[in-house]
Structures are given as C-alpha cells and as structure tokens.
C-alpha cells in the first residue's frame, strides 16, 4: 500500500490471483517509505497466507542469510533481490550457498570487485561505443565502502570513456590493496 495502516496487498494479491496471475511479487515497503526504513516482511507473510499462487518476497535482502530469514519468516516461495545486487552480483552465489548449505561465502576481494567493474565497463563499451556515461551509476556501486570512496565517486561523475573508468578502478585497487 501507499502508507502503513492502509494495507491493500493481501486483497490486491487475491484480485490478481482471481484474474489469472500465476504468481505475485510483494515488496514489503510502503510507497511512502521510498528507500527509507525497513521492509515489512509481515505483509509478505499475510499475502502468502491469503493466496494459493506462489509469492515472491522482496525487500531488505542484502545477503544469503537475509534470503533464508525471509523464507523462514514469511513462507514465501521465492525471493527477489533489488538494489543489493548493484555492484554486488556475488550476492546470488552467497544466497545459493546459504540456501543449499547454510553457510555464507567470503566477501569478494578488492581485486575481484575491480576486475568485475572493469569487465562491466568493457561490455558496456562494446555495446555503446566510446562514450559509456551510463557506467557512472554502476561504478558508484562498485566503489561503495572502499577507502577514498568519496574521491573515487567524484572522479566517476566526470568519467566518459573506458580508459577513464579503467584508471578509476586501477586507482581504487591501489588505494585498497590488502596487505
């Protein structure tokens, strides 16, 4: 729903099911929250109890343990990852590991992060040509949490070419090398 206390998700899910939907995805955050606050997983659980079709839960899944906890707490049939995958595609292997073995995987190294960021930029350049301005939004996520992230982000805002991004990712690697 739009705001807490005005919950329409279970009723809306029943209407979707009656109209022939084969599944519903539920983001447990009210529209009024935007990206603030915590997702309300109880809403997902209430939707799950109200329909016979699969329910896909979404909201506040940042690692494999979050995915397992959502499934345990809501009984949802599947989970959907949103912003947590930006700059962190490794989240999916962690989710798989936790769901299959109960164990989280180690975080990717700085070398792995920057190698993938560069590969992402290379693929975008092969698709878009010399100017890959759209890489800026993705690069911001890849450098999140690193030393000198503010300075790196400042440079990202003016990066245009693959060489620009390569230089930024190489600098991020030098600044954050694990000794």
Predicted features and spans:
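Short, small-residue-enriched loops and turns at beta-alpha junctions
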Residues: 1-5, 30-37
């Amino acid at each position: 729903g739009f705001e807490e206390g005005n919950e329409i998700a279970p009723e809306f899910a029943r209407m979707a099911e009656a109209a022939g939907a084969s599944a519903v995805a539920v983001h447990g955050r009210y529209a009024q929250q935007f990206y603030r606050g915590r997702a309300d997983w109880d809403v997902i659980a209430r939707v799950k109890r109200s329909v016979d079709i699969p329910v896909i839960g979404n909201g506040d899944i940042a690692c494999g343990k979050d995915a397992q906890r959502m499934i345990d707490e809501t009984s949802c049939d599947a989970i959907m990852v949103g912003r947590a995958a930006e700059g962190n595609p490794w989240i999916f292997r962690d989710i798989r590991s936790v769901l299959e073995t109960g164990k989280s995987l180690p975080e990717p190294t700085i070398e792995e992060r920057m190698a993938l960021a560069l590969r992402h930029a290379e693929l975008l350049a092969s698709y878009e040509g010399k100017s890959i301005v759209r890489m800026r939004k993705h690069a911001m996520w890849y450098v999140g949490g690193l030393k000198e992230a503010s300075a790196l982000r400042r440079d990202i805002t003016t990066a245009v070419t693959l060489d620009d991004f390569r230089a930024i990712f190489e600098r991020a690697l030098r600044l954050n090398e694990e000794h």
